[in-house]
């Protein structure tokens, strides 16, 4: 209220800039209410579907954003078949109900909408599985969609169309991709960007390596925080040396797993990396990331990142915009300049797979790949 009324700037210790920053953060927080990270939503949906299977609902199909596994979901929709609306669904509290829909809250936190199937459940869920940005009428004649199919894969087959996985149904330009061209879990050969107890991870180097070996991986890249990240117990130079000695020792216990020595080096305010050259040279791989002084305009952020990318010891640009989905907007960057710098310096870009980051944004990946840039899909793991 005080920001909107332009009053906070007059309070001691505040000014125009801080008032604007606080207002933007408050507006971002308010606009995020009721929205979910898919990574947090998924286990709740599994529990809900167990409850639905125990109710009077005979068939149900998740559709919309949640079915597409969108990184942010602001509505959860099920198409259902039922003789009548169930009196009880375990964990579900009814808010509103009419002949066609039922809305309520599951486990006191998740707003769910159930839509009663009017004509054919699979057909209706199929149509709603596409983003509003997709012109589905250019793909098939809606009036000729088949009835009585068990699932959307069967509908694609009946239309004599290649199957489009739900995750791609947000962008018509991606529909040419076939299932065999997409990354599957069994394609994962190793993991990059793994923190340990040396910084802010939960498990030791050896515990992380044991887990990687049990998963059948060929390599693991141990990547703790650098010295400027004091809040995350970042490694001073002596600790770097200590960790490298330990990795060499642990490596002797793993004949089928290669352990790489890495660091998530802070990109400092002037764009330099967080160690002198002789220390940077000791790593097999350097990921450079910004963790501090995030309030930047596009010119300052881009200049800072490009300088880091041009450092000869930099291998991967980590979580490029610094965003935390539903919590913090990322700083703006000039993607063209960043991509050109990465291509010129053979620096890969991280797709940070932490559900709260997913940074860089998936919408920019095709453009980066077109410039010959490799994408490193990393867990940013802090535990096994």
Protein language model regions, located:
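Divalent metal-coordination and catalytic microenvironments
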Residues: 15, 64, 142, 193, ...
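Short amphipathic alpha-helices in soluble, non-transmembrane regions
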Residues: 86-95
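An N-terminally biased module of ancient metal coordination in phosphate/nucleic-acid-related enzymes
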Residues: 173-267, 316, 323-341, 358, ...
């Amino acid at each position: 209220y005080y920001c909107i009324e332009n009053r906070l700037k007059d309070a001691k210790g505040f000014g125009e800039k801080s008032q604007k920053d606080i207002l933007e953060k408050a507006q971002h927080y308010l606009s995020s209410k009721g929205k979910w990270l898919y990574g947090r939503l998924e286990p709740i949906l599994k529990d809900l579907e167990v409850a639905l299977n125990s109710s009077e609902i005979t068939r149900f199909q998740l559709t919309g954003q949640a079915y597409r596994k969108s990184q942010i979901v602001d509505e959860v929709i099920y198409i259902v078949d039922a003789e009548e609306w169930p009196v009880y669904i375990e964990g579900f509290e009814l808010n509103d109900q009419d002949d066609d829909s039922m809305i309520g809250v599951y486990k006191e936190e998740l707003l769910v909408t159930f839509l009663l199937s009017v004509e054919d459940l699979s057909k209706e869920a199929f149509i709603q599985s596409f983003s509003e940005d997709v012109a589905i009428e250019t793909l098939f004649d809606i009036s000729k969609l088949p009835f009585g199919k068990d699932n959307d894969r069967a509908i694609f087959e009946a239309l004599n169309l290649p199957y489009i996985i739900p995750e791609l149904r947000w962008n018509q330009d991606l529909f040419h991709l076939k299932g065999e061209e997409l990354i599957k879990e069994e394609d994962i050969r190793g993991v990059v960007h793994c923190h340990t107890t040396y910084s802010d991870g939960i498990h030791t180097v050896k515990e992380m390596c044991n887990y990687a070996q049990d998963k059948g991986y060929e390599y693991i890249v141990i990547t703790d925080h650098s010295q400027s990240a004091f809040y995350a117990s970042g490694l001073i130079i002596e600790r770097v040396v200590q960790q490298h000695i330990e990795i060499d020792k642990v490596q002797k216990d793993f004949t089928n797993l290669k352990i790489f020595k890495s660091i998530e080096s802070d990109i400092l305010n002037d764009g330099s990396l967080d160690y002198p050259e002789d220390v940077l040279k000791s790593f097999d791989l350097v990921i450079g990331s910004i963790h501090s002084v995030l309030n930047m305009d596009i010119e300052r952020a881009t200049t800072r990142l490009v300088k880091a990318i041009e450092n000869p010891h930099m291998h991967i640009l980590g979580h490029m915009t610094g965003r935390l989905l539903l919590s913090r907007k990322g700083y703006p960057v000039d993607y063209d300049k960043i991509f050109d710098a990465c291509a010129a310096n053979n620096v890969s870009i991280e797709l940070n797979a932490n559900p709260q980051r997913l940074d860089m944004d998936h919408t920019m990946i095709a453009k980066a790949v077109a410039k010959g840039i490799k994408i490193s899909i990393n867990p940013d793991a802090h535990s096994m």
